[in-house]
Amino acid sequence: MDLEAGSIRPRSDGEGGGPAAGRETDDSNVWKDLFLAYKTLGVVFGGLVTSPLYVYPSMNLSSPTEADYLGIYSIMFWTLTLIGVVKYVCIALNADDHGEGGTFAMYSLLCRHADIGILPSKRVYAEEDPLLHSQSAIARRPSRLGKFFEQSITARRVLLFVAVLGMCMLIGDGILTPAISVLSAIDGIRGPFPTVSKPVVEALSAAILIGLFLLQKYGTSKVSFLFSPIMAAWTFTTPIIGLYSIVHYYPGIFKAISPYYIVHFFLRNKRQGWQLLGGTVLCITGAEAMFADLGHFSKKAIQIAFLSSIYPSLVLTYAGQTAYLINNVNDFGDGFYKFVPRPVYWPMFVVATLAAIVASQSLISATFSVIKQSVVLDYFPRVKVVHTSQHKEGEVYSPEINYILMVLCVGVILGFGGGKAIGNAFGVVVIMVMLITTVLLTLVMIIIWRTPLVLAGLYFVPFFIMEGAYVSAVFTKIPEGGWLPFAVSITLAMIMFGWYYGRQRKFEYEMTNKVSLEHLGELLARPEVQRVPGLCFFYSNIQDGLTPILSHYIKNMSSLHTVTIFVTLRSLLVAKVDQSKRILINRLGPNGVYGCTVQYGYADNLSLEGGDDLAAQVTSCLQWHIQMDTDGRRSPEEEMAQLEAARLAGVVHVRGKMRFYVGEDAGWFDKIMLGFYEFLHGICRSALPVLGMPLQQRVEIGMLYKV
């Protein structure tokens, strides 16, 4: 096995199979990686590679000179090199969580290795994680920093807030990328036709986005095969135009690679130069997708695609744009279309529009995935999540989120109008996500990889200073449009925190008032309690004990089904749960009463393809458990007969619906937060429809909890 950057990776099939077998496997892997690298062009890099459409138009330049443009290009070159190549390609892609990437994947990785999750039900221990289980006891021993997080609830809450903020900013990216990409592409129509007004461009852009959002429910499988060719055409044509501009306008542009031009730029422009960082930061837009989309592609494929095509394409395209602008210093307001030669103007307009649509689709799909992960882990109110492809598990769609995104995207276009105002808002999202990644990645280095503090500091200090400078610059844009992502992120964070707080209080109440097996036996021994025919799936949120709603149910209904299975849906801070560990069954003691835990990770499909299928899977696991477990008080044949008779009598799914009753003596914080939670709980979907239970088999039992 190979140990690489803290993750363990099994040998490939060709290793150890002889020289010929090894060469065949290596050749096969090379072609597979190249094909995956080609596919990443249409999914991963859409936002990054289309950034030349709006970087220069988003800058607030005032009488720029040749020296200014050389300094700006030098800043963009080193930003792409340091953040794109060094940070993401060389370092961040190694901080995966079982192949999944992104800020929340790093958070889940930290929670497992240092046991710093907030809710006990969300923690994962060594026996549940094959990576942790395979490590030695010394490797699993927490570091000093890990112990600090374990002992400080405040530090753990801050860490959760940082991870949640990263998710909220990514959702903000899903609002702004479609708006700025499509608007910047369609704005090219005003070049040949100056009489076309900006409101017409905005209306066309809004119409395209509305059509794109309305098509989301059909999935992208039928058209996704076009994404990579479109982005490949864009990726390879823009640098060709860039080379033409370099030769034609300014052959010496690459002298700007020298950091001297950055120093000279800031010394010359001082405060204005610092403020211009709010525009240059957009050159790295979409780089976070390299890490966030790691679960859909291999690390090597993303590295190959970025280093062989995306990075050279952006370097040459920006060099060509800058070379053109040095000779046409006042054309920065339309810095992309002005540098496109007239003979290829309309073909490039078509390619740019299609590329902007593909980039928008990539961010919309990423937003759906983030929302799905949050719902699965119970950090976000339940919304409908539909899998639009039978072959691609990660292809999901949420109707509620889709229409909210559509309204916000169209509102951004019509409300902000120009790309410069949207660019101000966009810069805040871009750099905040990257700064959060830097912080979490440093924690991963120290706590998990056990990187010496000196080496971790060599990573953290330069990137924190560079990204901190960008953050300070984009914060000055808050009055000019930068407030939008903050408003969206704060709203989302309030929703997630309110939901989390209510779920935590509910969990604490259930743990305090849980029903023990002894108490269940006493309830069933009462003469008025009858065992009625049927198979009952009784859903609970706790593993150790039974939900207090059970006592409420038995006392009021005076009955319990002959076979009752208490089902706990347990979300783990892992990407995926092995199928063999998905459903766990155990006997609880009383006749016909069993416990079942359904485990899933944040990248798993929560739905088990319909209620009948869930009943069949759990029943099948229970039958196997009965046959293998010889410690029962009754014979396996007798228990099997009872289970079959109960199944034939009818299946019912029972879920408790506990509501908070906030009394007059409750504190002001509880009144606000629990009232907000009750509002969210009232408008969100029930857990049973999310699992696909048939309507006629569902029963909900209400119970009030006085605070």
Curated annotation (Swiss-Prot):
GO terms for cellular component: membrane. Residues 56-71, 179-194, 244-276, 327-343, 424-427, 476-480 are extracellular. InterPro entries: K+_transporter, K_trans_C, K_trans_N. Residues 1-34, 93-157, 216-222, 298-305, 365-402, 449-454, 502-707 are cytoplasmic. Keywords: Glycoprotein, Ion transport, Membrane, Potassium, Potassium transport, Transmembrane, Transmembrane helix, Transport. GO terms for molecular function: potassium ion transmembrane transporter activity. It is a multi-pass membrane protein. Glycans are attached at residue 60. It is found in: Membrane. Its main location: membrane. The keyword Signal does not apply. The keyword Transmembrane helix applies. High-affinity potassium transporter. Belongs to the HAK/KUP transporter (TC 2.A.72.3) family. PANTHER family: OSMOTIC STRESS POTASSIUM TRANSPORTER, POTASSIUM TRANSPORTER 17-RELATED. This is Probable potassium transporter 17. It comes from Oryza sativa subsp. japonica (Rice). The lineage of its organism: Eukaryota, Viridiplantae, Streptophyta, Embryophyta, Tracheophyta.
